[in-house]
Amino acid sequence: MQKKIFITVALCLSICTVKAQKIPDSLAQDFRNFLAKNFSMYRTVNLNWETKWAHNYTFTQDGNELEKGKRRDLHKISFSTMIPVLKLKKVSLYANVQYRSYQFDAIEKTHSATSAIFSQDGYDYFAGGLNGTYYINVFNKPLTLSASVIADGWDKGFGKVQGLLSAVMIFKHTKTTTFTAGIMGMTLFSSIPIMPIISYWHRFNNPNLSVDITMPSQFYMRYQLNSHRFSAGASMTSDNFYMKPNLKNVPDICYFSEATLNPEIVYEYIINKHFYLVARAGASMVMMAGLYSDTRKGIKVRNEEGQTEVEPLVKMKRNMVPFFNLGVSYSLFK
């Protein structure tokens, strides 16, 4: 079913492209600048350190408790880079690399022993790939078509390869308002083959105040005064790494994933048009967390509405915890 959807979308887009008009020369550059300014992940280099408060957690499988414990001294260092390989008026190609290091202590509370699941005090995660974007004009509206291939792994070997396709149309792009809508599909780790993407940015009559919404991933109110920008809102993020849990009835190598919703306050000091210092503080709330097989496969279950959902092989629950993040970013684009 997923392959049929991807093929249908690809055919529709290829038909539209035949009658496409020329895209304005400045649009591709404007779009890159907008992404770099409002989305740190699209900046050329990002380096971040993050810490979370100690918290209790519980792992369950089929309703049975496997481990109840506590994680403390949590630290994460993350590095990412997007390097332009090819940048033309209508086409861009980027190579990207990500590295994350997780450090924490995990104690099983029943016997005050080292966790059987988090048996190490550190985990490394690597990912890298290529992203290509094509800028065209369809029905007098700019359209960006993107495709990515990403491979990941850890310090003990290779993980998986996944693909991502997206089509985003820019319905409005002025000095005060940008509105886009589109679709995105993934080949792995998603029970929804295709999902909508909607983004809206607007600067109010007060030129320092703006709203920045990207559904379903983030919402922010921003206030910028000279080189200082303050934001209040929320974003969805995830922490992922491969591990070897000491558990029965699960694969030897598992993929730990923790998807979170993070209400937060963000302060950015814009050193110049290329460098940013960023500080974040807020709360981390788990939406879905647990262990999957290294192929990202979970257990298919039916919810109360009768819809099929994919759950982890082993579920994890934890408390909402405060976090603090400090980082620096560099962007080639102004």
PLM segments and residue spans:
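Repeated loop/turn-to-beta-strand initiation elements of outer-membrane beta-barrel proteins
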Residues: 88-92, 137-145, 176-181, 207-210, ...
